[in-house]
């Protein structure tokens, strides 16, 4: 019975938050370092290079996201410097700034480049990798019966990798390759779910760093019907 009420309470809270966003249009909110963050004002700017910039403002803060002007999912902290998220805070004349620029560090996400061949016996196996600027990255492979790798899960993040590094899964014919998408201290994802009547709706989450390597987390971000200005 207690479990039932806990699930029911969670569901009611979720519905309440969703309704709060939809009844306060436009809306942009999330959790900054596990504390609720809500913009007083939100707007979208359409840029000449085919991207948009979404800004959410409080009295002293700005959360900014720059992504292509199209429905889709976009990784942050990659080699593409034109796609990023940032957070700035102004206090007594000082500005504290965090951004999802590419950072050297433990791997956060990989993307398959070439499935290679000869890996049939390694489906579900954890393998070492070679290449890139770092070391220690291990992957659990998903492999077709014909020996072609179709994906992998990171089991050990390693150290000192850079976005854009190409690494090779050891085994088979040693020809299955992956790209390091982003690293642990600077990463994230923006999803534009809907563009409708000059407004944008979607989700955002990211880890961003300042010049000293300090990390800021922005999670559970939702923007709803934010208009173009």
Residue map of PLM features:
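Beta-strand secondary-structure signal
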Residues: 29, 53, 64, 109, ...
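Surface-exposed helix/loop patches within compact recognition domains
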Residues: 45-104, 184-196
């Amino acid at each position: 019975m207690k479990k039932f009420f806990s699930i029911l309470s969670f569901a009611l809270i979720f519905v309440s938050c969703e309704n709060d966003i939809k009844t306060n249009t436009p809306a942009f909110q999330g959790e900054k370092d596990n504390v609720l963050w809500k913009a007083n004002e939100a707007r979208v700017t359409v840029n000449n290079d085919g991207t948009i910039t979404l800004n959410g403002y409080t009295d002293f803060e700005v959360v900014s996201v720059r992504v292509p002007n199209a429905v889709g999912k976009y990784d942050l902290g990659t080699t593409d410097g034109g796609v990023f998220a940032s957070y700035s805070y102004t206090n007594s004349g000082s500005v504290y700034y965090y951004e999802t620029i590419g950072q050297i560090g433990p791997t956060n996400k990989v993307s398959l480049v070439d499935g290679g061949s000869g890996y049939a016996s390694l489906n579900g196996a954890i393998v070492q990798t070679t290449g890139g600027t770092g070391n220690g990255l291990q992957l659990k492979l998903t492999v077709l019966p014909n020996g072609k790798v179709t994906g992998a899960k990171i089991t050990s993040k390693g150290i000192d990798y850079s976005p854009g590094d190409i690494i090779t899964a050891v085994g088979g014919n040693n020809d299955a390759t992956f790209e390091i998408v982003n690293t642990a201290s600077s990463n994230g994802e923006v999803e534009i779910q809907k563009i409708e009547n000059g407004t944008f709706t979607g989700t955002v989450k990211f880890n961003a760093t300042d010049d000293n390597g300090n990390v800021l987390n922005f999670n559970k971000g939702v923007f709803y019907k934010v208009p173009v200005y």
